[in-house]
Amino acid sequence: GDVYKRQADVILPSTSWGEHEGVYTAADRGFQRFFKAVEPKWDLKTDWQIISEIATRMGYPMHYNNTQEIWDELRHLCPDFTGATYDKMGELGYIQWPCRDESDADQGTSYLFKEKFDTPNGLAQFFTCDWVAPIDKLTDEYPMVLSTVREVGHYSCRSMTGNCAALAALADEPGYAQINTADAARLGIEDEALVWVSSRKGRIITRAQVSERPNKGAVYMTYQWWIGACNELVTENLSPITKTPEYKYCAVRVESIADQHSAEQYVIDEYAKLKASLRESAMG
């Protein structure tokens, strides 16, 4: 089940990505159609049908027959999108905005600012800022730097990918703390051993992944795990300008665990409790 179901008052079943069609957009300004692979089972609706029915019941009528009608409405509201028609995208077509004309002569814009930037002098503008030291400080008690990172395999909080046996075979709970071989030797930690990672905010158990990949003094952890949840460690130190949390710099301590057998059982028990709680929530 999805962890967000625990917070929901109403759950409306919708089609998955392979059960409907529409248009994808990406950070490269591209639009591309995608197509339904299989017919949905049971009493499901697409997201746009659900949103339309909710809006209509709340006094804002929304009536569409298909996704093309929705897309046509959207592109006519934005001049840069107007030329990106369903027909022009075709089966495997790919249109990058600006695409302002519906004629075939306008095939979109592969990259912006080909001749000059949209500034008074036609040049790009770069801004610098002064370096500011991290708010969290290393001490004898917390001598290592934790950075939260991403890795291939699982997505976000694993509410979906965590149910895939193939991905679980690649990596599973309680996740990993990547540390340098020199740090591992100094701390008496072996590869794949369970360890405690502590910060000023909290403490979690996870599995050591020892290699030369991390820098000495650094600890890298992904945020997908429920047991080895690195977000339990990071503090909410915010940048005064962007308000971005200082998740890439957190002072921590890594400790070996003498009784590995008991630690393994602890992880199994805690994981079972979490899954049981999610299962009960999903069942209502």
PLM regions and their residue ranges:
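Short gly/Ser/Thr-rich phosphate-binding loop of adenylate-forming enzymes
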Residues: 7
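Short, small-residue-biased leader/transition segments that mark boundaries at the very start
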Residues: 1-4
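Long, low-complexity segments enriched in small/aliphatic residues
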Residues: 68-166
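Long, contiguous, secondary-structure-rich segments that constitute the structural scaffold
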Residues: 41-43, 47-95, 162-178, 182-284
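Short loop/turn segments at secondary-structure transitions that flank enzyme active sites
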Residues: 18, 60, 132, 150-152, ...
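Short beta-alpha connecting loops at secondary-structure transitions
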Residues: 13-15, 19, 29-40, 163
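Pocket-edge structural micro-motifs
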Residues: 14, 52, 119-121, 127-128, ...
